[in-house]
Amino acid sequence: MTVGRYGLVAGVVRISDKLERIENLLAGSDRQVDDETLLDSIGDMATYCIMMAAECMAIAMNVPDTADTVDNRVLVKLLFDTITNEIDRLCFPVPNAVADAKFLFNRMELSALSQDMTEYARYSGTYQYARMLAAHMLRWFVYGSVG
């Protein structure tokens, strides 16, 4: 999300796009990507909502737009190392090959998402956002839901 450049309207646009995509999937419209699922779109929308909530907190707390400090990098890295270790602890041992493949796929997605998250957290300077998204990611990848 490009909140820094366009303000909170960037989040509203992304959430609106995802909501429209969800409505289309529910209506049975053609998928834009072959393996696109309703659950993927809902997860994406939840992530954008968390990003907006954290951005609102950062605005309320007067967090500077650029807070790329060594301390922030260390905190964000520690957070994602912790969440990755927790996922490892909860998911192993995996009883069969299908579950194993699914777990590895989720870990790859988690890794990509955590890299995006780290970049966003550096830019926005809001560690709170990283904490919120990490909690969301743990629920999503381990328990299969955000609720």
In which residue ranges do the predicted regions lie?
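Intrinsically disordered, low-complexity regulatory regions
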Residues: 1-147
